[in-house]
């Protein structure tokens, strides 16, 4: 299983990161003779521009050129953000629109991350693992291979306090919709966590747990194969 960053490494990364407030600015006006700062990315025609820049750089530019601007619209979706979204260019996985994956998360080959899922810094999505819609992997949460994390499920994150242990999910585990796995819990290989369960203690390999708090109700050997099948076709990428 891939090793995640330690809590101390993540804390240092966040502390040292330059905090960013990026803007997307739509602006109309007369820009003849206007010099745009080198830090701006500027697109458009003579009288209509789209500008990508930092808020701290935009303010002095706007104050100096306000008289040339006739219309203005600004989009800002974060403030003093320390962790950018992950660059997925070289990620060999299926990532659907609307997934939020932060830098320093690890997405292994053949994984699937569905719409609305959130993968926080230091989390690991194992090879062939599916993170379903609106599921959350908190900081340092780690899954093995061929895991299914159901829609709306939460694998709690641990960055603060740094001494806390992360959630660890072994290979071939099924986690039902809206289940919650609390900090420090280890779910053993091939286990099944029922929908809506709240897991507060380690789950043995091959066990089926359900309830609040979750308790072992049977073994996976008692569950029909069709109800615990991981479908490889859903993980297939282009040939």
Curated annotation (Swiss-Prot):
Disulfide bonds: none annotated. It catalyses: (S)-2,3,4,5-tetrahydrodipicolinate + acetyl-CoA + H2O = L-2-acetamido-6-oxoheptanedioate + CoA. InterPro entries: DapH, DapH_N, Hexapep, Hexapep_transf_CS, Trans_hexapeptide_repeat, Trimer_LpxA-like_sf. Its EC number is 2.3.1.89. It comes from the Bacteria. One of its GO terms (biological process) is diaminopimelate biosynthetic process. SUPFAM superfamilies: Trimeric LpxA-like enzymes. GO terms for molecular function: tetrahydrodipicolinate N-acetyltransferase activity. CDD domains: LbH_THP_succinylT (cd03350). Pathway: Amino-acid biosynthesis; L-lysine biosynthesis via DAP pathway; LL-2,6-diaminopimelate from (S)-tetrahydrodipicolinate (acetylase route): step 1/3. Keywords: Acyltransferase, Amino-acid biosynthesis, Diaminopimelate biosynthesis, Lysine biosynthesis, Repeat, Transferase. The keyword Transferase applies. PANTHER family: 2,3,4,5-TETRAHYDROPYRIDINE-2,6-DICARBOXYLATE N-ACETYLTRANSFERASE, ACETYLTRANSFERASE. Belongs to the transferase hexapeptide repeat family. DapH subfamily. Catalyzes the transfer of an acetyl group from acetyl-CoA to tetrahydrodipicolinate. This is 2,3,4,5-tetrahydropyridine-2,6-dicarboxylate N-acetyltransferase. It comes from Staphylococcus haemolyticus (strain JCSC1435).
